[in-house]
């Protein structure tokens, strides 16, 4: 049994919904891969070939690379192959959040969250959307810290992530640094050089987090993201307090674009990149990472470029960012080989470019471990799905004909413990190193998403899945038109043939891996509703049982 699934069952998911299916794990150890063994490519030595995929393998890729598989993409991957699909996605024009907010008929508080839902469910550039969401959990800002009224600024920040999802990490780091939303969130905006008479010292907030969380981490890393140890077995620090103080001095003298006053500006532009005020910038000499010296007398922009180059070229960046992207997209516990292979692509792709996120994402998704990890390491491969992704997956699977203009699920965090750009701190909703107490921790593994899972959250997400399936399968159940109605037209056509219906739902929601026990539970429930007028009820209840099962809670 997969360890994550075992822990889910042990934490009483099924007790909260009143049923208890058995183990869904299928022994795949002796099965042949769906396509040929991995061959070397110019990007990564352990990439899978670009052959058409079986449906279950197409589903697995789409779970990793989108906000939920849809039938047309599963079928398309059965004709083309993963690399063709990835390339096509990377060429698809971006769907920007700010455009969606501007087009909204009204902009009540937190409307940007509803726009995020719309794009996650319906946008054609699914891979870009999923990568931007992953980046938003690494380069964190949050409306939860006094920015809730700055909807356009928040959407513009998210657009920076969308714009650079397949660009270069150095450019992303530059635009994130000068975002006034980031400037407000981590105190870079209005940061001043030292003035002892006024008891002013440069703020260290952004300097600390750009190093600790956004780029290199706290300790020196090998290419596989394992720590480099000293002779006593202690991890070597990547920087010290003096390093932070020097970077804090670099990050002085920036404020709103066109601000008329540095200390008390009235023109609060949360969209345009911040601009320098040289009189507030510390122009003294500084020492950065790896003892790189910054000469005295340089302006704010020149020093910023030197500092970001210094961070970007640190050897830690490749493994630090690569591992977190793997965790967000594919599996919580990637092997050292997987991380190293991807980090090497980040460090230098086939064109000799460092920091190419397009190459990095392709290396993550095309790596043998991403495609065959469920076979090679069935006990530990995979991850618990984030609550937001469990919701988008159910809505995408039964593609709604439309999303009502009055649709509102902006209060999602109170139910799911998670909302876009709303983490409780700069450390995101969960830490990449969080390890669930018990067997997971005992085995030295991590389980980030388990940090926001407990009995109460299980009940809440189950109730939300109930509302999004049984209660919302057509608009007549919602007189205000605020819910997304799943489209079960296809499923109603299949309903007379029970096996065909369950095979279809199995593919759409579980990638064809439904356990015999879960199938038996669903059949028993449908048998209990075996009267002509209950056909739609049988369908939506079957969907709910699958969507709320431990099998659907895991990405494998």
Residue ranges and their predicted role:
Residues 1-7:
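Bacterial N-terminal signal peptides that target proteins for export
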Residues 9-13:
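Hydrophobic helical h-region of N-terminal Sec-dependent signal peptides
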Residues 17-18:
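C-terminal motif of bacterial Sec signal peptides marking the signal peptidase cleavage site
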Residues 27-114, 152-322, 326-556:
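His/Asp/Glu-rich metal/cofactor-coordinating catalytic motifs and the adjacent surface-exposed loops
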Residues 112, 122-130:
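Amphipathic interfacial helices
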Residues 127-131, 143-152, 198:
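Short, flexible active-site-proximal loops enriched in glycine and acidic residues
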């Amino acid at each position: 049994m997969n360890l994550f699934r075992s822990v889910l069952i042990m934490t009483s998911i099924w007790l909260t919904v009143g049923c208890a299916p058995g183990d869904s794990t299928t022994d795949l150890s002796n099965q042949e891969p769906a396509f040929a063994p991995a061959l070397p490519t110019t990007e990564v030595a352990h990439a899978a070939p670009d052959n058409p995929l079986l449906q279950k393998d197409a589903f697995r890729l789409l779970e990793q690379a989108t906000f939920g598989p849809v039938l047309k993409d599963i079928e398309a991957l059965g004709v083309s192959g993963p690399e063709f699909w990835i390339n096509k996605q990377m060429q698809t024009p971006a769907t920007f959040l700010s455009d969606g907010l501007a087009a909204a008929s009204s902009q009540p508080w937190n409307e940007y969250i509803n726009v995020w839902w719309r794009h996650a469910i319906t946008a054609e550039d699914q891979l870009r959307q999923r990568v931007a969401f992953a980046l938003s959990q690494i380069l964190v800002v949050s409306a939860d810290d006094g920015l809730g009224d700055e909807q356009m600024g928040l959407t513009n920040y998210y657009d920076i992530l969308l714009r650079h999802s397949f660009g270069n990490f150095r450019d992303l780091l530059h635009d994130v640094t000068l975002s006034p939303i980031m400037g407000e969130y981590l105190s870079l905006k209005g940061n001043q050089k030292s003035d002892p008479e006024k008891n002013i010292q440069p703020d260290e907030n952004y300097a600390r987090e750009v190093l600790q969380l956004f780029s290199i981490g706290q300790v020196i890393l090998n290419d596989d993201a394992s720590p480099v140890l000293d002779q006593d077995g202690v991890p070597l620090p990547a920087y010290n307090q003096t390093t932070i103080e020097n970077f804090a001095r670099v990050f002085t003298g920036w404020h709103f674009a066109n601000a008329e006053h540095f200390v008390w500006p009235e023109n609060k532009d949360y969209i345009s990149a911040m601009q320098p005020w040289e009189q507030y910038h510390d122009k003294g000499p500084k020492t950065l990472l790896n003892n790189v010296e910054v000469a005295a007398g340089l302006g704010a922009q020149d020093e910023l470029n030197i500092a970001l180059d210094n961070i970007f070229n640190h050897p830690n960046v490749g493994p630090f960012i690569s591992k977190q992207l793997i965790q967000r997209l594919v599996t919580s516990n990637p092997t050292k080989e997987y991380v190293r292979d991807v980090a090497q692509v980040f460090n230098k792709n086939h064109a000799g470019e460092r920091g190419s996120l397009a190459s990095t994402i392709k290396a993550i998704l095309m790596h043998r471990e991403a495609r065959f990890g469920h076979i090679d390491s069935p006990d530990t491969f995979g991850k618990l799905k984030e609550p937001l992704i469990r919701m988008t997956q159910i809505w995408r699977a039964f593609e709604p004909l439309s999303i009502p203009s009055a649709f509102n699920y902006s209060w999602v965090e109170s139910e799911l413990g998670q909302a876009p750009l709303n983490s409780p701190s700069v450390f995101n909703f969960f830490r990449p190193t969080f390890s669930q107490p018990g067997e997971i921790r005992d085995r030295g593994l991590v389980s980030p998403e388990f940090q926001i899972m407990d009995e109460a959250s299980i009940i809440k997400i189950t109730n939300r899945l109930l509302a999004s399936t049984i209660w919302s399968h057509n608009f007549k159940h919602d007189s205000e038109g605020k819910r997304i109605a799943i489209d079960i037209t296809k499923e109603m056509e299949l309903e007379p043939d029970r096996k065909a219906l369950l095979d279809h739902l199995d593919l759409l929601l579980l990638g064809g891996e439904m356990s015999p026990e879960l199938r038996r539970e669903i059949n028993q429930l449908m048998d209990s509703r075996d009267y002509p007028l209950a056909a739609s009820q049988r369908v939506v209840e079957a969907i709910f049982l699958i969507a709320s099962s431990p099998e659907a809670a895991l990405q494998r």
